[in-house]
């Protein structure tokens, strides 16, 4: 079974071979080309095998340990597509091995439905961990579906409209170390959402199709995780307060409070239990593009992201992660979530479940390629990505 999985994964991986290695010279006669065919084939597959065999080895001699992987995928939302992800690990202070390395991930995707995506995420840890900088930038174009705002709107499968969603976001964050594992700082966030080709524009209830949102925020966090992209132990807690005032050019003035708690515990050999409780709460005149969204590849997996949306969101998930053989692993998770207009109108009966299973392949040292299949209430979805969901 493991061999079959390995073969299947190898078939979908993209390997970029230097051009001069394949050509083996600027000019080649037909005879010389025939004579070197077997050599080139053997060289290609040897390099292919060695690339992925060595990709998860720690390379301390490299200033920037960078690798790339990609392949086809399928999901109920985006259909058949081709995704590419790249991961890099580095240390700003290469002599200090006591702190977690910095990491950066670049990702791109294109599918047969017309969806395309390009993004970058990263965490930079400065010498002695005095400062941390986080970056999250992306752009995508997606033929989307919109049910409206509120639980009742989302639960009606047929009450929806189609439109094309173009979204771009830049979020920069800088944190200062106040005490061991305790950080505080500020961020800036810009997001633009443009909705085009609505089948039924009445779903927006007169709201603007193009929404720009810009604002600063304050952050305080406690982080004892041993490795940010894939923790094996530790605790993470963060409180974030974002402001989007009208005087900064926002059409709608509102505020957002986000809380995030995560705990990681080693169990038996190769086993980790991870849990997360997360909430997002909006106050003021929140535009339709900035209300809290349920679903996607990081939480409440199985649900179409944004089918259920409202001012406020609370969600919880617990995931069991087990390494089974060499670089291969499996996961299983369960959880629940709820969207609601405000705390006074929270209803337990509107809580939705999520559960699923996943496969992990260690692409780089403690950096996993993630294949998940999630289930919700009458829905399911497949996800391909890099790094753990949380």
Label the model's feature ranges.
Residues 26-55, 64, 134-138, 145-267, ...:
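Transmembrane beta-strand segments of outer-membrane beta-barrel domains in Gram-negative
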Residues 55, 65-74, 99-112, 118, ...:
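Transmembrane beta-strand segments that form the barrel wall of outer-membrane beta-barrel proteins
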Residues 217-220, 357-363, 379-390:
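Outer-membrane beta-barrel "beta-signal"
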Residues 216-221, 225-324:
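C-terminal outer-membrane beta-barrel translocator/porin domains of Gram-negative envelope proteins
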Residues 68-70, 86, 104-108, 133-137, ...:
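Membrane-embedded beta-strand positions of outer-membrane beta-barrel proteins
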Residues 93-95, 129-133, 180-184, 227-229, ...:
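Repeated loop/turn-to-beta-strand initiation elements of outer-membrane beta-barrel proteins
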Residues 58-67, 73-212, 368, 376-390:
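Gram-negative/organellar outer-membrane beta-barrel architecture
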Residues 1-32:
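Bacterial Sec-dependent N-terminal signal peptides
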